[in-house]
């Protein structure tokens, strides 16, 4: 029996991180590795900013008060490392269940294996990871260019009469910290796209769905649960936005009302990104539902007619009692199966899966509330929502 198909859990970078001890399966060791990488990216900027007098003052935006940087490197970056260990195995196990549960018909197994092979080729592509690294540096230089356009000195870029000038802390940020973070983000997106491509290929197969399956998704309900760990990625992105909004509210004059719409858009986009790809199974699920309703409807009609003839029209043997007869239970079972088919979902995930993802998106926004209200009130709101 195949327990997992590691379609995204691997590749050159993954093996490198394993070799240097960043990726460990056990909690404490994994947390330690993630913390080491975060400190490697963040601590030199702290030291260099302090040496230049830009730690808590000296410029309008000193290092310690740039909450977006701290959220990105001390919270979001470690979460991306955690996601490397958490998400891959869950999705790999989900891929194996297509075969384990007989969802792939024997005639479709070769095409399923082709989809697996394609995903593995993408996972192992060193060229693709080099492209991701180049994009990370391009993104870092674009961020630096944006900083040069500001009219206010920051810990990373100073506005001088001769023009903007990058600081030593800014050099580390531009050439090490930001590219490292963006590489992990872009790589996570590539891994997700690889998985979504696999799902697209599988959705094109003639799957053996069971319309009466208790998961109300023809047997594909496990996919919704497998996508819940993607909430770690949503949590990571949300942390960056939270740091940015805290800075805007505390130093940019923004308000809580002004960020409500962007937060709502962020949540909607993350739900679409993390759960939207499962919609590719909608045509097959709806076809299975229609076919099931027709077949079980015909079966229920025949059985109900026989039940009617036997027990209401005098067709039952004289020595057979209705009480205790298995006919009633069989009629109820057929009715229950028909109702279950009627309740089939058009997608292989439910409200609980979406709710878990929304919670992961909103959890990092708690510090934003703390910028405009007492921490006690924030705690009450959080406890009320969780309760």
Where are these regions (language model features)?
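Long, internal scaffold/assembly segments composed of regular secondary structure
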Residues: 183, 187, 193-261
């Amino acid at each position: 029996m195949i327990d997992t198909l590691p379609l995204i859990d691997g590749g050159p970078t993954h093996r490198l991180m394993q070799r240097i001890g960043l990726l460990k399966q056990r909690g404490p060791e994994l947390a330690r590795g993630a913390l080491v990488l975060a400190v490697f990216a963040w601590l030199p900027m702290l030291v260099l900013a302090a040496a230049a007098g830009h730690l808590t003052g000296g410029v309008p935006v000193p290092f310690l008060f740039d909450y977006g940087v701290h959220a990105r490197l001390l919270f979001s970056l470690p979460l991306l490392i955690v996601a490397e260990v958490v998400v891959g195995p869950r999705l790999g196990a989900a891929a194996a269940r297509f075969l384990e549960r007989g969802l792939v018909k024997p005639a479709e197994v070769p095409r399923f294996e082709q989809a697996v092979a394609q995903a593995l080729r993408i996972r192992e592509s060193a060229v693709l990871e080099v492209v991701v690294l180049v994009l990370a540096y391009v993104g870092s230089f674009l961020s630096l260019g944006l900083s040069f356009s500001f009219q206010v000195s920051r810990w990373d870029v100073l506005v001088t009469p001769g023009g903007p000038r990058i600081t030593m802390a800014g050099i580390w940020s531009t050439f090490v910290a930001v590219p490292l973070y963006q590489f992990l983000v872009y790589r996570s997106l590539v891994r997700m796209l690889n998985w979504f491509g696999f799902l697209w290929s599988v959705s094109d197969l003639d799957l053996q769905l069971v319309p009466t399956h208790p998961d109300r998704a023809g047997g594909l309900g496990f996919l919704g649960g497998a996508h819940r760990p993607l909430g770690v990625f949503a949590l990571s992105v949300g942390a960056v936005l939270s740091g940015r909004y805290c800075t805007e509210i505390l130093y940019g004059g923004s308000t809580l009302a002004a960020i409500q719409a962007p937060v709502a858009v962020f949540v909607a986009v993350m739900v679409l990104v993390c759960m939207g790809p499962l919609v590719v199974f909608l045509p097959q699920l709806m076809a299975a539902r229609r076919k099931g309703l027709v077949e079980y409807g015909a079966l229920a009609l025949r059985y109900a007619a026989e039940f009617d003839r036997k027990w209401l029209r005098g067709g039952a043997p004289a020595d057979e009692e209705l009480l205790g007869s298995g006919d009633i239970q069989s009629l109820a079972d057929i009715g229950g199966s028909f109702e279950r088919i009627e309740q089939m979902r058009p997608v292989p995930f439910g409200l609980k899966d979406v709710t878990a993802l929304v919670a992961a998106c909103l959890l990092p926004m708690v510090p934003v509330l703390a910028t405009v209200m007492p921490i006690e009130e924030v705690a009450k709101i959080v406890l009320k929502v969780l309760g």
